[in-house]
């Protein structure tokens, strides 16, 4: 089984329109709304290929029920760690001529209690001899050692570790020498 940990999931809205006119009212032709964030996307892709997966994600109080319902609809087993705040929303605007504009919110702040709840979620399932994937950009204000610390925790329970991130948090996570990057 491959367990994904998404600390900063998003509700992704994709909007199609012929032409985005800045400073004007724009009418869209098509909209889709999907559960996302790198780890969630990994679990969705694994599930599509028939690979057993389990998603652990941190959601703000506003957005947690939506994620729970959406992941249930696609039959992805999951645990949602609740945090104060609003789960981030990302908007992608696709214009008829091919231009793509993305607007990504920063996400919620993670407290030590929330990180401990993520560890509890890892302890609640069998991670020994399974893969744990830590994926995505860290939340604003999170210590850069967050992925490293969580990965060391998972490894101490016998998990194999994959890291999919960038920037200082990725560099810090490399100190624990993950099994896959």
What residue spans do the PLM features occupy?
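Glycine-rich phosphate/adenosyl-contacting loop at the front of the ribokinase-like
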Residues: 1-56, 65-66
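Structural detector of well-ordered beta-strand residues that form the stable sheet scaffold
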Residues: 3, 54, 79, 133, ...
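Cofactor-binding loop segments of dinucleotide-utilizing enzymes, especially the Rossmann-like FAD-
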Residues: 5-9, 58-61, 83, 96, ...
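Conserved N-terminal subdomain of the carbohydrate kinase-like
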Residues: 24, 48-130
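Residues at secondary-structure transition points
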Residues: 30-37, 86, 109-113, 145, ...
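Amphipathic, non-transmembrane alpha-helical secondary structure
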Residues: 44, 116-123, 148, 171, ...
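Rossmann-fold NAD(P)-dependent oxidoreductase module
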Residues: 45, 70, 149, 153
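Conserved beta-alpha-beta core of the PfkB/ribokinase-like small-molecule kinase fold
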Residues: 131-181
